[in-house]
Amino acid sequence: EGDGLGDDCGKILGDRDGYRGQKHRWYLPEGRLVQFGGCQHSGDEKKYKGQAKDFIGVDEATEFLESQILYVINWLRSADPNQLVQLMLATNPPSTAEGEWVARWFAPWVDPSHPLFGSVKPGELLWFVLDGDTYHFFRSPAEATEYMEGMPSPPRLHDGSLPKPQSRTFIRSELADNPDYIRTDYG
């Protein structure tokens, strides 16, 4: 759990200074910390409870349950209101039904039946609102807020205000994007 990522980062950075393998943590200059972990089983996501993160990266996202990702991103936050917090999901197409949630999250880019499919470019930001089990996508935060205001039971923060709309984008990757893999039998 996490060992391969530590090895890969060591290759990228040129050394493993600051890496603590047993804890799967990499202490970087200026007090920064990279923590590697996993969620092999349902319930494993709970070990990340209460640990604020300004970036969460998930490799092989379709191998996770949607509920695990939704739980972990509850801790995607910063005490600094100017700090950008980000979630990055990297994955191949789903190989099981449990991974199909990823297609819903990125439907405007990957689902030909979605009304926005073909009109949004890779990397273009859309704002989304989760209404029940359905993601609704909008071209601006104002459109997303307007939608929330019209919902019968809109989501509310603890102070009663509407949450700030969140953005999402999708960038397709191909084998040709990685020359190191082209030279192998990966594809």
Q: Which sequence ranges carry the predicted segments?
A:
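Phosphate/NTP-binding elements of NTP-utilizing enzymes
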Residues: 1-187
